[in-house]
Amino acid sequence: MTIKAVIFDWAGTTIDYGSRAPIVAFQKAFANVGIQISEAEIRQDMGLDKYTHIHKIMDLPAIQNDWQARFQVLPTEDDCNQIFSNFKAILLSSLTEFGQLKPGMSAVIDYLTAHNISYGTTTGYDAEMLALVLPIAAKQGYRPAVNITSEQTGGVGRPAPAMLALAAEQLTVTDPTTVMKIGDSVNDILEGNNADAVSVGIIDGSNIMGLSELAFNALSPAEQAERRAHVTAAYQRAGADYILQSMAELPALLDQINQPVATDH
């Protein structure tokens, strides 16, 4: 097998260590209408497009109960739209703050370029959010050839394979088994599996880990190992083909997969 294309997620995978920007925006948007939501309630559905994610949060029994207690009615579609609009405004204003490439990404970009492996992205961001992130990434040397949002796939996002399939098509890769999908959430892994791609989960700085770099580095070695084991188990349950501690391990994995098969003469 040879990997011809690598498709990355954005927040928590290539930028924004710990996938903090969406968490902060979700919490602020709900707090603005008097509803408190936990990180765990948000993170369980990370990887979905943000509009769908708002609906998922609204459907949580605890949120429905809090909403009814506060407003005497259940949340409506208009309520979802209002919160999404507020969420988007908050996120757009904060994306530049969280746009730094994660450790190891610069070396990965150099490796992919040197080995003529094309790369692109799929994302839960919409086009407007992506338009803010792309130039920030480009200034750091990260310029994916294609960037797919669910707006380009008729609103069908993860865990369905549509965005990944479109990314591969635009990169002119016809065999999905030669595509590697790298992400930091369960929905990223499911997207890869559903597309028949090679799915890879990143541990450190992931959505599943849920810690900023500062917070993670403040943990004891034993606590770090425990957190990493928790993330590893989540990826294993989702069916990840490979699990990497950090992006720095990706070049070695690609070398391993892409090494020529020895033949007898």
Swiss-Prot record:
Protein name: Phosphonoacetaldehyde hydrolase
GO biological process, one term: organic phosphonate catabolic process
Assembly information from the UniProt record: Homodimer.
Pfam families reported for this sequence: Hydrolase
Coiled-coil region(s): none
Cofactor detail note: Binds 1 Mg(2+) ion per subunit.
Cellular component annotations (GO), alphabetically ordered: cytosol
Active-site positions on this chain: 9 (nucleophile), 50 (schiff-base intermediate with substrate)
Cofactor(s) in the UniProt record: Mg(2+)
Function: Involved in phosphonate degradation.
HAMAP family reported for this sequence: PhnX
EC annotation from Swiss-Prot or TrEMBL: 3.11.1.1
Enzyme category, top tier: hydrolase
Family classification: Belongs to the HAD-like hydrolase superfamily. PhnX family.
